[in-house]
């Protein structure tokens, strides 16, 4: 695949070619050659179309050439609809003529990677093989199986069949396609180039992306971030989530971060919304194209059934939305409209008033949307079905729908309707005026959640100047300590010892109790390579003799033990994902960290605000805030550790993983008491130059991350 670092590439041959040849054109609707030939001929008013068939004089009433060499001109783009064994010969003929692009429909092309290399060497490009084709509404180009209607959604898909499903679902939902590209095997042109090209595509407002792999994920998500900055957000559908790679992970950090976790973090950093199913993708796409970016997570629920209101509130809360109490002014307004005893504090139950007067639906929605603490309203219940069950009410109900849409526009807020008649005239009228209407409350809530995510501001980035002098990354605990101390992370006072005399020297310089560690062993607890609570020199020497007898010679580390009360053991780690780049992790630590699986992960580096939010979203956050009379611990210092490690992993391509576990977080500081550093041997890794705006120093923040307690100062 061509390196995305060479972007932008000229993809004109695949977006608006001046001439097209379909090799393998056919009259048979069961063959690819038929669909690509009919599609190509639809654009004959814009470009020259050549059909090639070695055994037919005409196809679809159009004259055919027996081969490319017989054409009167060299086509800019050639679509390959021939058996795999014939592809190489057709491509060689095309390259000899000066063809600029090849669309590989055929699967199983012999030596496809070698063929792609020869195509690139000739100055041409290959899309595919195993592609379902492409379509561009702006340039009237269709070289794909299926039917397309023009519209604002671009689809880039690694699976042609799933891409076809999306096209069909979109058509049912009234969404047209601006561009469709089935990337197939990505032997040359990959998703990153195609996504980058969409930034300037006139008709595209929203992008749907299906990918199964992220081989150059940093470049890919960079392109997605630029799309979002251009006002064209992306909905990502992917599969996976396997933890197979965790079986070979050396650190807890590696075993706690799956590919799915990292993809989720990359999506947040790039402003991409990950969806789980094709139907969810189409639902959110319909909502976005109807509403745009005026949604938020603070939701008011309005309904004419207490049961439906309650279900909606539960589904919204489970979906990460907030259902806050309404303000006093809103409650007072509702009190003047609703029957006594009706729920007015969110959810709002109309308690029969809507049935008595349909305009109540619009009036109450206006009341709740006027509340500055509300971003979005969800209307659930019977509205939309009155006219279906009683046609005499149709006109009146449609008028109320108009008022609801006008309220959403005037308040510049989103209204989503859950209706029991999703295919009725009222639902259609609501959609037409920018108010989504769905038949299931979970779909309505999922849409609100997706729209809120797409309405968030894109996280900012800036450059990270790298330090001029970088000490090499070396394995072992002592080297890890020195690396961390060099970037401002405090560690317990310690001495390196290989002999009994050096152990005695350490005991004389440090304050007991002592900790003894075999510094070259990564997971010390499993190997009995760490001993705690050594009260004096005699106990320390005895422990050293016993440990050395079991484990052999090596770099042993004597540390002063952190004995502060009220500490919670946490983990802070960072690693370099092979495809998606550096990430940072924080979570509940200790030897049982994999059991609890309580972590937060983001792409590195992160600003302090993001680090603090990572800590706050942990399941153990209540434990950190103080539990059953215990004082709260210092999460600010914990977040500083997260920032420091995120900057370190981003700046050092020779660093594969770094982990602090446990980090003892007390009321007055966070102190790492063990660390693991794993170097990478890939000298070709690019330095990551991203840094968030609130970073203070040109290298790393040199604030001490040590607790304020005198007990842990050197």
What are these regions (language model features)?
Residues 683-689, 695-709:
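Ser/Thr/Pro-rich low-complexity tandem-repeat tracts
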Residues 573, 691-692:
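Short intrinsically disordered coil segments
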Residues 1-683, 705, 710-714:
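Catalytic-core regions of core metabolic enzymes
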